Amino acid sequence: MENLYPVPVNTMKAAAAEPVTQSAEVLRLRQVGLEAIASLLTDYGLVCEQVGDDAAIPGSFWGDSEAGLVADRLLARADTPVHSMLHEACHYVCMTPDRRDGLHTDAGGDYDEESAVCYLQVLLAGHLPGIGRERMMQDMDAWGYSFRLGSTRSWFERDAEDACQWLLAHGLVDDLKQPTWRLRQL
């Protein structure tokens, strides 16, 4: 399967980015370690699991090295990009409880939710030691996320107010634009 990744563009509608190869210079799980990501996501009730290096990743929508979601499990291999793990984790956080209950592979959601997922992904990276927001934005650009203003940084700093408002309205960030470490309830 081609490695296409949905990202907000122009009016924050999801679109497919260019296919990316395994050689993309992004942080991978093997460089960060499962424990760091699992610790970050524990308050969300997500269980992080690492599969074998040659195993297919259960629940991976895009296949290849992309992270997978099955119920409350975030699955990855050593070569899974950290941005992919955070992106899928943020889908879990942003989806409604009924979608979480039946979750297997396809996180679904609408265009506004996809924007919120990308925004929260950057915020959460700021809480991962040795990664931070800047590196996450660089990796998102390197992987092919596409935004109207060109770069993830430009979008995040100057064009993502609607994503932030969506997160605030659903109780997922506070007034200081910090994660609340809660799941969406409605």
Write out the residue ranges for each language-model feature.
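Pan-zinc metallopeptidase signature
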Residues: 146-186
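Active-site recognition of the HExxH zinc-binding catalytic motif
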Residues: 83-96
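Secondary-structure capping and boundary motifs in well-ordered enzyme cores
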Residues: 74-82, 109, 113
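Post-HEXXH active-site segment of zinc metalloproteases
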Residues: 59, 93-123
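Short helix/loop segments within enzyme catalytic domains
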Residues: 124-140
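Short, amphipathic alpha-helical segments
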Residues: 31, 111-118, 130, 134
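Auxiliary, metal-adjacent structural segments of Zn-dependent hydrolase domains
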Residues: 2-68, 75-79, 123, 127-128
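Short, mixed-charge aromatic SLiMs
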Residues: 110-112, 142-151
